[in-house]
């Protein structure tokens, strides 16, 4: 897929999911759509684990989305849920979506630990680099995905080390290609 095709797929994805998003009903479709149609991942359902079981304090919990080959753990919330506020979870513990994901990650076997944690509420995607001493969210809104989708290459590429420096050039190049593509369409 060319950059222009990916950008267009990202635009269509953003338009399709604007104003939609129920955690239980739409979470799986959202990520399958993004991984396959925007990032071009083949055989998504064979390569991604949905509702992966993890035992926390003796209770079985479920990780919404886990991508084993890139060690990405995704905690999905419904549209409108704030990603920076504590929410009462099924264990009657108030945690932010990141804290909930980190708790799951802390209870995974060492070889399955997340390299990246993502929290999402359908309108926002926050990425945390678990190699950072103090992980801070890189925030992408749904409307920004057409210009910033390369930041989400962490979902499919094992070799991404940081998402700021190496992606900045790619995003700028993508912006230029996108402008050229749009100019040719006129």
List PLM regions with ranges.
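Short, basic/polar, glycine-containing "phosphate-handling" surface segments that engage DNA
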Residues: 1-18, 56-59, 63, 70-72, ...
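Central hydrophobic cores of alpha-helical transmembrane segments in multi-pass inner-membrane proteins
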Residues: 34, 39, 67, 72-74
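Broad hydrophobic/π-residue packing in well-ordered secondary structure
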Residues: 30, 39-43, 65, 104, ...
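Acidic-basic catalytic patches of nuclease active cores, encompassing PD-(D/E)XK
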Residues: 14-49
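Short, solvent-exposed loop/turn elements at beta->coil junctions and helix N-caps
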Residues: 49-56
């Amino acid at each position: 897929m060319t950059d222009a095709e990916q950008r267009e797929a990202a635009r269509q994805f953003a338009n399709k999911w604007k104003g939609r998003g129920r955690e239980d009903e739409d979470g799986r479709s959202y990520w399958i759509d993004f991984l396959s149609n925007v990032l071009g991942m083949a055989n998504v359902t064979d390569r991604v684990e949905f509702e992966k079981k993890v035992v926390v304090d003796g209770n079985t919990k479920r990780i919404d989305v886990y991508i084993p080959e890139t060690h990405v753990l995704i905690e999905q919330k419904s549209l409108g849920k704030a990603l920076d506020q504590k929410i009462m979870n099924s264990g009657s513990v108030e945690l932010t979506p990141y804290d909930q994901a980190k708790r799951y990650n802390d209870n995974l076997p060492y070889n399955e630990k997340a390299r990246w944690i993502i929290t999402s509420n359908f309108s926002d995607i926050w990425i945390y680099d678990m190699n950072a001493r103090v992980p801070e969210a890189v925030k992408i809104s749904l409307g920004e995905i057409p210009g910033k989708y390369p930041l989400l290459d962490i979902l499919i590429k094992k070799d991404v080390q940081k998402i700021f420096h190496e992606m900045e050039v790619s995003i700028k190049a993508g912006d230029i290609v996108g402008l050229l593509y749009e100019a040719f369409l006129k």
